[in-house]
Regions:
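N-terminal beta1-alpha1-beta2 submodule of the flavodoxin-like/Rossmannoid cofactor-binding fold
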Residues: 1-131, 194, 198-252
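Short, glycine-/small-residue-rich phosphate/pyrophosphate-handling segment
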Residues: 38, 130-185, 203-206
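Short acidic/His/Gly/Ser-rich catalytic and metal-binding motifs that mark active-site loops
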Residues: 67-72, 181-191
């Protein structure tokens, strides 16, 4: 696990707030099962270290290791699956103030495990919080992308769009990643000539640091504010007939 740089440690020591009441779920959507090393895990380590240095409770999940069935229902064993670990995984994500999804790039796209995670999150999108809003309101999300082909921004675009559609709040610059040279070659953290590749890449370290801190800042703001104000966005109130000043569409 890479250590934080002096600059990153200095930022942690001068934090403008406390974050030790926050929880973060870092979900690695690598296609590799444990104990195979994951390049995506290596970059997620940087985010995890920044969070932990600020007292955040960090829960690491390698999605590939869990027997999560594909589908868009809360429990796919009720829809034909032989087994489904999602009912055990879901509370770990639901209770986190911060969700960071890590994915490799394959054929210019996020991994199939990442797509499955997003679909399972979508299956929970009808859940409501105590204010009658969708369950993901008041939570923040970001993503980490690795690979040795272009596609960081394309993958980040899809992941972050999906998260905001579900109700997550996305801070500025909520994606970061590393890609190597085009074609087969070393990936993030691979050792070449005695040195790990990409660890000292300033662009990657800067963007990863900015993402981690923007997630912390926004999670702090939303938590202190009690979440997103509950007006004009409550599914329970809409279903009860409230239209929040929406004009009557009938012709008069």
């Amino acid at each position: 696990m890479p250590d934080l740089s002096d600059r990153q440690r200095d930022l942690c020591s001068t934090a403008p707030a406390t974050y030790d009441d926050l929880r973060a779920a870092l979900v690695n959507c690598t296609l590799k099962p444990s104990p195979q090393p994951s390049h995506t895990d290596t970059l997620l380590d940087v985010v995890g270290h920044i969070f932990q240095a600020n007292g955040v409770e960090v829960d690491r999940v390698r999605f590939r290791d869990l027997e999560v069935a594909p589908g868009v229902y809360p429990d796919m064993t009720e829809h034909g699956a032989d087994a489904d670990a999602w009912p055990e995984v879901w509370p770990r994500i639901r209770d986190a103030h911060i969700l960071v999804i890590g994915t490799p790039i394959w054929l210019g796209e996020k991994s199939s495990e990442c797509q499955k995670l997003i679909e399972r999150l979508y299956g929970m999108s009808s859940e409501l919080n105590d204010a009658g809003q969708y369950a993901f309101y008041g939570r923040v999300g970001g993503c980490i992308v690795t690979g040795n082909e272009d596609g960081i921004k394309h993958v980040g675009m899809g992941v972050l769009y999906s998260l905001q559609h579900l109700g997550y709040t996305i801070p500025p610059q909520a994606d970061a990643g590393w890609i190597g040279e085009a074609g087969p070659g070393p990936s993030y953290g691979d050792v070449v000539d005695g040195e790990p590749v990409g660890i000292d890449n300033d662009f990657t370290q800067r963007n990863t640091t900015f993402m981690a801190w923007n997630l912390l800042h926004l999670a702090r703001m939303l938590t202190d504010a009690g979440g997103i104000p509950a007006h004009g966005n409550q599914r329970s109130a809409w279903d009860a007939g409230c239209r929040f000043d929406y004009e009557n569409p009938e012709y008069r």
